[in-house]
Every structure is written in structure tokens, then in C-alpha cells.
């Protein structure tokens, strides 16, 4: 039995778009301040045909729903240049304390890159962490983050589409249990 509580770390790893494998010298971004990750299944809904007489149902033929992805909303408590660049294609310029984030020009189109998303969630027994559930989405592409700026803290919400990594022959999602978190 797993008792999962609190996202401990999120790792985004750039993929080679032709092979689906991790890109050599690709971007790897780590989030240690993730607040929430919502995974909504994307389904191709099956059909249901009913054959009936005026006063009774004679037969029902159904085809199953099939999953072909997840739509993910990842909320972070900080705004990371590496994450924004990988997920949404932001260009980052300037010095570390005075960085400038810019969306691509319209003529450039979308410049986000495909990536793998690993979400690590603590697994508890009593009051102790025994290991971590590693939720892996094997092929993702992002959108520009939603911005809600007001009286409170700004927390970017990254919208991500996770699909099967056909090139690498990997499923949409995998869940494994690991003993430790990866090093930064």
C-alpha cells in the first residue's frame, strides 16, 4: 500500500525529437518547489449502440474508451528560466539577477521542445518517508504558462500534453518506486 503525499521534485529532460530518447547535451530542468500536478486523461470515447423494440432493449453493443494521453497542469511556486525555455520556448537573456524572459516572435512559431517529465512523490509509512513514487510521462510538449498576477504570490501554471513516446516504444505514463531522489 502506498501513502503518497507532497511533490518532492520534478525533473524535465529534453528529448531528441527523432529518436524519443534523452537528447545528448539536452536541457535538464529541476523543480523543487512544485505545488501541484493535475493529470487529466485524454480519451477517445467509445460508442454505444442500442437495439430496441418499442417496449424493451434487445441488445447493447459497446466499444471501450481508449486513452491516448494526459493533459497536465503543473503549478510551480517559482518561475524557472530552464523550465520556461524547455516547456514554452521562452528565450532567456541577461545576467542571472536581471534576466529577461521573452516569448518567441510570431514568425518563429512555437519553439518549445519535447521532454520527459518525472514527478517524485513521497511514500510514507507512519511519519517516515520509505521511498518515492516516480511518475514518468514519457513524451511531453508544453504550452505557454497561464499568468495570474494579483495581490498574492505569482505561481506559473504550465500546461503540458503528454502522449505515447512511439519513437522510443514507451507508454504514455509509468509509475515506479525508487529509494532516493535524483541529484540536481
State the predicted function of each range.
Residues 1-86, 138-150:
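Solvent-exposed edge beta-strands and adjacent loop segments
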Residues 18-28, 120-131, 172-180, 184:
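Acidic Ser/Thr/Pro-rich low-complexity disordered segments
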Residues 42-49, 87-93, 106-110, 128-135:
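N-terminal start-of-chain detector that recognizes signal peptides
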Residues 64-118:
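Extracellular-facing segments of soluble proteins and assemblies that are Gly/Ser/Thr-biased and enriched
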Residues 64-65, 104-109, 127, 144-155:
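Exposed beta-sheet edge/beta-hairpin loop segments within beta-rich domains
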Residues 82-86, 91, 127-129, 145-147, ...:
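Short acidic, gly/pro-rich beta-turn/loop elements at beta-sheet edges
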Residues 131-184:
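Mixed-charge, glycine-accented linear interaction segment located at domain edges/termini
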